[in-house]
Swiss-Prot record:
Enzyme Commission designation: 3.5.3.8
Binding site for Mn(2+) 2: D151, H153, C242, D244
Full protein name: Formimidoylglutamase
GO molecular function: agmatinase activity; formimidoylglutamase activity; manganese ion binding
InterPro entries for this protein: HutG, Ureohydrolase, Ureohydrolase_dom_sf
Catalyzed reactions: N-formimidoyl-L-glutamate + H2O = formamide + L-glutamate
Annotated keywords: Histidine metabolism, Hydrolase, Manganese, Metal-binding
Family in the record: Belongs to the arginase family.
Organism superkingdom: Bacteria
Length: 311
């Protein structure tokens, strides 16, 4: 039995006098039902247990409802059906929640849906990838899955327990065990937020990355070419945005705010470029922490990125 979505979060302005073209997200979205045809589906991962284990600022568990509230009043410009499939709650059982989320993602992908995950800590990444891997690996082949992560951190840590700092290490181990290539691209990496040991680990694993100071307006063509080269090397794309890739002035509501970061305009541009490749299979937004947000600034940015992924 899957949890029902809280549709009371979807409230906003109604411009009935403007006609049928004046709809907003809260008027378009519907609660997910198992007989729904192919559509865009939002699935929340209400967890900050991984953040706690990673010694970060907790509060991301409230990210999914905050993101829905920020989405609710946005103008709707799409034509496809849109559903809310509710949240997978983690509490202290992170590993169990990741398994449940992965199974749900695989189910939804198997029904032809476009899934966008709403975090929650970045521990959502291992759950998302696991679901996509299960979906694509059913025929016993070797899918070339690319992971595109917008993030100030590699999240390749060694740890006894899974956390928000370990998901891509876990994915690398999953790929090694399955005999699959590990294709990981990280854009916006902060040199001062990752130790030399993590850079060495990234090199050993063949991670492609650009530093935050490289993903800048004056260097846009290089960033585009770097992304395009990665996209050409894969068949299926899993895209994840950790909101701490953005400058703290734009995204204060995260576990680890960035002193430098990558401007929102560039992140959105590159997200749209990745989506336009036609290889996007699954996406999520991670690390929204309403407890430290200011005037819903981070939630609004996250909502804009979700809209870019859906529409």
């Amino acid at each position: 039995m899957h949890p029902a979505p809280d549709m009371s979060l979807w409230q906003g302005r109604i411009d009935s006098q403007e006609g049928a073209g004046a709809l907003r997200w809260h008027q378009w979205i519907r609660p997910y039902h198992e007989s729904a045809g192919a559509a865009s589906v939002l699935l929340g991962f209400a967890s900050d247990e991984g953040v706690r284990r990673n010694q970060g600022r907790q509060g991301a568990r409230q990210g999914p409802p905050a993101l829905r509230r920020a989405l609710a009043n946005l103008a709707w410009h799409g034509e496809q059906a849109l559903y809310d499939a509710g949240d997978i709650e983690a509490a202290e059982d992170l590993e169990g929640a990741q398994e449940r989320y992965a199974r749900r993602v695989a189910e939804l992908l198997g029904r032809g849906h476009q899934v966008v995950g709403l975090g929650g800590g970045h521990e959502i990444a291992y759950a998302s990838f696991s679901g996509l891997a299960h979906h694509l690996g059913r025929d016993g082949g070797t899918p070339r899955i690319g992971i595109l992560n917008f993030d100030a951190h590699f999240d390749l840590r060694h740890a006894e327990q899974a956390s928000s700092g370990t998901p891509f290490r876990q994915i690398a181990e999953h790929c090694e065990a399955s005999g699959w290539p590990f294709a990981y691209c990280c854009l916006g990496v902060s040199r001062l937020s990752n130790t030399a040991a993590l850079f060495d680990q990234a090199q050993r694993l063949g991670v492609r990355y650009l530093l935050d100071r490289q993903v800048q307006p004056w260097n846009l063509e290089r960033s585009e070419a770097f992304l395009d080269s990665f996209l050409q090397s894969i068949e299926h794309l899993y895209l994840t945005v950790c909101l701490d890739v953005l400058p703290a002035a734009q995204a204060p509501g995260v576990s680890a705010p960035s002193a430098h970061g990558v401007e929102m305009s560039l992140v959105e541009h590159l997200v749209r470029r990745a989506k336009a490749s036609g290889k996007l299979r699954l996406a999520d937004i991670a690390e929204l922490n309403p407890q430290f947000d200011n005037d819903q600034r981070t939630a609004r940015i996250a909502a804009r990125l979700v809209d870019a992924l859906v529409n």
